[in-house]
């Protein structure tokens, strides 16, 4: 948002754009975009399989309130956690957030991978703010963890754009074509990222969609405050 509003990036066209859904493109005009989503990381419920049984795993936001999960949940201070809180507020409302506070959710000042390592070690039993791609990688290495989507899977999306004053604009366009094309997207999948034009068995949520930079900053601050007031340190 800020890059577009500041004029740092410029509109571009690519033959690869046709396969991308409209929601994955920030349109500049009828044929050009400011950027297109080239990778997505999805946030959902990650849990230690030795500490939470299959019967206890929540299938939606409401089931985070199960009595057997009280005192077992945690989140981080990362902005990604605030985005999940924003989605909970959107779909479940203030009353749900007040009840969630009674679950004694712990708050950790950690980046996502450090937080995941606590989950693997059993310091944390489960969290609704865990990245699917990170769980897949660690699960493949034998870690006792798994991941499920809830009502929505909040997407952290990365995009490909062209810098306005790129010294070699044609090379920049070729690189962008590669990244958003078939071969580039295969590379993204090797890192277990999601692909914007593929279907997944969950609904994706983009909290920032339709907002200006200022609107999103205000919303994220509100969500962060709600995150802190709902959790325990």
Task: List where the protein language model places each region.
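A ligand-binding cleft/hinge motif common to bilobed small-molecule-binding domains
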Residues: 1-2, 125-144
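Extracytoplasmic ligand-binding site segments that recognize negatively charged/polar headgroups
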Residues: 1-120
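An extracytoplasmic/periplasmic, membrane-proximal ligand-sensing/linker region
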Residues: 193-233
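Periplasmic-binding protein-like
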Residues: 41, 69-76, 99-101, 106-109, 141-166, 179-199
């Amino acid at each position: 948002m800020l890059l577009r509003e500041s004029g740092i990036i410029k509109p571009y066209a690519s033959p690869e754009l046709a396969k991308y859904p409209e929601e994955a493109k920030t349109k500049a005009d009828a044929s050009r975009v400011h950027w297109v989503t080239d990778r997505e990381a999805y946030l959902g419920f990650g849990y230690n399989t030795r500490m939470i049984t299959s019967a206890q795993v929540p299938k939606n936001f409401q089931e985070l309130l199960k009595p057997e999960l009280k005192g077992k949940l945690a989140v981080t201070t990362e902005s990604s956690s605030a985005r999940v809180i924003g989605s909970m507020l959107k779909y479940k409302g203030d009353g749900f957030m007040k009840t969630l506070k009674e679950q004694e959710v712990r708050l950790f000042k950690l980046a996502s991978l450090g937080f995941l390592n606590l989950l693997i070690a059993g310091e944390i039993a489960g969290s609704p703010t865990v990245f699917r791609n990170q769980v897949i990688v660690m699960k493949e290495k034998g870690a006792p963890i798994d991941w499920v989507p809830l009502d929505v899977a909040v997407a952290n999306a990365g995009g490909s754009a062209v810098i306005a004053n790129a010294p070699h604009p044609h090379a920049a366009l070729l690189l962008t074509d590669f990244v958003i094309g078939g071969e580039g997207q295969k590379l993204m999948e090797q890192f277990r990222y999601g692909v914007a034009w593929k279907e997944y068995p969950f609904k994706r949520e983009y909290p920032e969609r339709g907002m200006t930079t200022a609107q999103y900053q205000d919303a994220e601050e509100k969500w962060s405050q709600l995150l802190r007031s709902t959790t325990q340190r």
